[in-house]
A protein has these predicted regions:
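Shared catalytic-loop signature of beta/alpha-barrel
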Residues: 85, 91-94, 100-214
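Metal-dependent enolase-superfamily TIM-barrel catalytic cores that perform enediolate-based chemistry
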Residues: 2-103, 107-108
Length: 214
């Protein structure tokens, strides 16, 4: 928990007013959790570990910084529901990729926890998104301009989301070019929620691609 809290405070000190963390990748001692560790109903030991990490971060950043939990679809709907119910008292902004991205599973996690569900980096077209919207299975979409068909298609997806009162956080963890494209799109839609700024964007090999620092 102390490591998570320290890194969270560092991000806030750099000026970020929202942070996103995967609390279920690293084991307390060393190494990473494997897929089987995060599937099905979780043990009390894992639940206590997860809550301790979330609690430490919330206490470190205070009540006015948005906290997003990210699961990368490593958990399934059952374990995600357990985790969401456990930590929703810490004012979670939204729950990203809590399970394999299907409308039915996303709706299950949302209904069980009451948390806003974010999904989209593995959803690619209007025809896939529409089923999420119809079932109220997603509250924040995360289409990637580089994988969903470009600026025109992503704009259509965002406009469709607006009809269903669904917000947008463009998935942006690629090159400076994809970051710039995401920012241009976000300025042109009414349902923009938050801009994602990945640590990869600050890597020297990415910054060297740019004439101007960003």
């Amino acid at each position: 928990p102390d490591d998570y809290a320290r890194e969270a405070k560092k991000a806030v000190a750099e000026g970020y007013d929202a942070i996103k963390i995967d609390f279920f990748t690293f084991k307390p001692d060393e190494g990473n959790f494997n897929d089987n560790d995060r599937l099905g109903l979780l043990s009390p030991e894992y639940l206590q570990m997860y809550e301790a990490r979330v609690k430490a971060v919330r206490e470190a950043i205070g009540p006015n910084v948005d906290l997003i939990i990210e699961n990368h679809s490593f958990t399934d709907s059952q374990s995600a529901a357990q985790l969401g119910n456990l930590v929703k008292k810490y004012n979670i902004f939204y729950f990203e990729e809590p399970s394999t991205p299907t409308p039915q599973l996303s709706k299950f996690v949302h209904d069980e926890t009451g948390l806003p569900i974010a999904n989209g980096e593995r959803i690619y077209t209007r025809w896939q998104y529409i089923e999420y919207f119809k079932q109220n299975a997603i509250q924040v979409i995360q289409p990637d301009v580089g994988t969903c068909g470009g600026i025109t298609e992503i704009k259509k997806i965002c406009d469709m989301a607006h009809v269903f009162d669904v917000g947008v956080q463009v998935h942006a963890c690629g090159s400076p070019l994809s970051t710039a494209a995401a920012l241009h799109l976000e300025c042109a839609i009414p349902n923009f929620v938050i801009h994602e700024h990945h640590t990869y964007a600050l890597s020297p090999y990415n910054k060297e691609l740019c004439i101007h620092d960003y």
